[in-house]
Amino acid sequence: VRDQADVLIVAGDLTNFGKPEEMEPLINILVRLRIPIISVLGNHDYESGRESDLIQMMSSVGIKVLDGTGYERDGVGFAGTKGFIGGFGRGMLTAFGEPEVKAFVKASIDEALKLERAMAQLRAPKRVVVLHYSPIAATVVGEAPEIHAYLGSSRLGEVIDRNGADLVVHGHAHHGSLNGTTTGGIRVHNVAITLLQSQEPSVAYRIF
C-alpha cells in the first residue's frame, strides 16, 4: 500500500464486536504497513462499549482517529466522524412522536453536527470526508430496500454539500454500490471491504 498511496483511510468496523483483543492483532498489521493511517470507528466497534479503549489503542501507535474532528496533512484536510442512520431524502425520519423516536433522530443530528464542526476546522485546499455510514442513497443501492434507512442519512450529505469537499469515503453498506454523488455533485465512494471483494476477491482497498 505504501508504494501506491500517501495515506491509508479506514472507514470503520475495525473489529467484529468492539473488543480490544480484536483490535490488537489488527494494529500489529497496520503498524507494519509504515504509512500514515486515518480512521473512523464503525458500528461494530461500539458493540462492547469499549470504543474509548479502541481509540486509545489506535492513537498510541500513531493512527489518527477522527470523531467529529479534522486533520490536515500535506495540503489535504480530512474531516471525519462515524455518522449515523436515519434514512435518505423524503424517507428520512423526523423527530416527531414518541421520545424514543426523538432520541433516535437526535443521535443522527448530533453526528451531522459533529461532521459540520470537523469540516469547519479544515483550511487545506483539498478536502476529504471520512465516514462509516453513507451520506447518500446511491451507494447503498444493492442492499435490501427495507434496511436503507439503517445504512446512513441524508443529513450527512447536506453537511458535505454545505461545506464542500473533493472526495467522500464510507463503509457499512456491505452489499451496496461503489460510487455515487451528493446532491451537489461531490464524489462519494463506498469502500466496504465486502463490497470491494465481491467485485474482485483479491482487492482489499481502493486507490484515489
Regions found by a protein language model. Give the residues of each.
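Conserved catalytic scaffold of divalent metal-dependent phosphoesterases
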Residues: 52-151, 192-194
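Structural motif
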Residues: 6-7, 76-77, 126-128, 167, ...
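Short, well-ordered coil/turn segments that N-cap beta-strands
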Residues: 6, 35, 124-125, 186
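Core catalytic region of metal-dependent phosphoesterases/phosphodiesterases
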Residues: 1-74, 143-145, 150-163, 192-193
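A structural motif corresponding to the C-terminal end of an alpha-helix
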Residues: 33, 117-126, 159-166
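Binuclear metal-dependent phosphoesterase catalytic core
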Residues: 141, 154-166, 174-208
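Active-site environment of divalent metal-dependent phosphoester hydrolases
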Residues: 15-20, 43-51, 72, 85-91, ...
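Divalent metal-coordination and catalytic microenvironments
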Residues: 8, 13, 37, 42, ...
